[in-house]
């Protein structure tokens, strides 16, 4: 089965949210077949940083990235989820 790489930008609820803990909660919430490969922090403004996550997921997922977006948005500490990039892996 083919897979896709999805780059997701996650904004925390506030500046006080520890991004490392948020990343671990998101990684723990991913279902089977999904894998968090890489991550980094992106400065936004006034001390606020976003998480940029590289997630591998199955290509034939009903609803595309919507399932992933909904799953991440339900994690405690997440304010906003935005898909920045999607690419099929060979």
Curated annotation (Swiss-Prot):
<comment type="function">
    <text>Promotes the exchange of GDP for GTP in EF-1-alpha/GDP, thus allowing the regeneration of EF-1-alpha/GTP that could then be used to form the ternary complex EF-1-alpha/GTP/AAtRNA.</text>
</comment>
<protein>
    <recommendedName>
        <fullName>Elongation factor 1-beta</fullName>
    </recommendedName>
</protein>
<comment type="similarity">
    <text>Belongs to the EF-1-beta/EF-1-delta family.</text>
</comment>
<keyword id="KW-0251">Elongation factor</keyword>
<dbReference type="InterPro" id="IPR004542">
    <property type="entry name" value="Transl_elong_EF1B_B_arc"/>
</dbReference>
<dbReference type="Pfam" id="PF00736">
    <property type="entry name" value="EF1_GNE"/>
</dbReference>
<keyword id="KW-0648">Protein biosynthesis</keyword>
<dbReference type="GO" id="GO:0003746">
    <property type="term" value="F:translation elongation factor activity"/>
</dbReference>
<dbReference type="InterPro" id="IPR014717">
    <property type="entry name" value="Transl_elong_EF1B/ribsomal_bS6"/>
</dbReference>
<dbReference type="InterPro" id="IPR014038">
    <property type="entry name" value="EF1B_bsu/dsu_GNE"/>
</dbReference>
<dbReference type="InterPro" id="IPR036219">
    <property type="entry name" value="eEF-1beta-like_sf"/>
</dbReference>
